[in-house]
Amino acid sequence: MKILLFVSTKQRLENPYNLGGIEILNYELFNYLKNKHEVVFSKKVSQKLVSINWDIIISSNDARVFNKLKSKRKILWLHNKLQIEKALRKKQLLSILFNKIEAVFVSDYLKKNTSIFYNFFKREVIPNFLP
């Protein structure tokens, strides 16, 4: 299974000791999945990534990647509250509305407080798994 973990960050993903919370969660998920699947952990959309037909794309807090890449499943991993104004300002609203996205929230609070206007295909809660 081909899985892309995409995180929009300025951090250097090669050095896990200098990563922030969201990046660490993605890095740990990458390490967990890489033994069983073909997994790529990236912060940029390269031409090489565009040429691949992904089975799953998991993007943290950034739905715009779903417009650029092909995937059978599109999962938006929401770590923060996504208000409609913020989605407009960050140019994510159309990506959310026009892609068949599954939303994964890190808490029941986020799931409950994310607008139903975002017509997510599926809504699930998976708590953060940091120790």
Model feature map: region roles:
Residues Q47-N53, R64-S71, T114-Y118:
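Short loop/helix-cap segments at secondary-structure boundaries that form the rim of catalytic
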Residues I75-L76, A87-I101:
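A conserved, positively charged/aromatic
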Residues L5-K10, L78-N80, N128:
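Short loop/turn segments at strand-loop or loop-helix junctions that form parts
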Residues F30, K111-S115, R123:
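A generic structural signal for short, well-ordered alpha-helical segments in conserved domains
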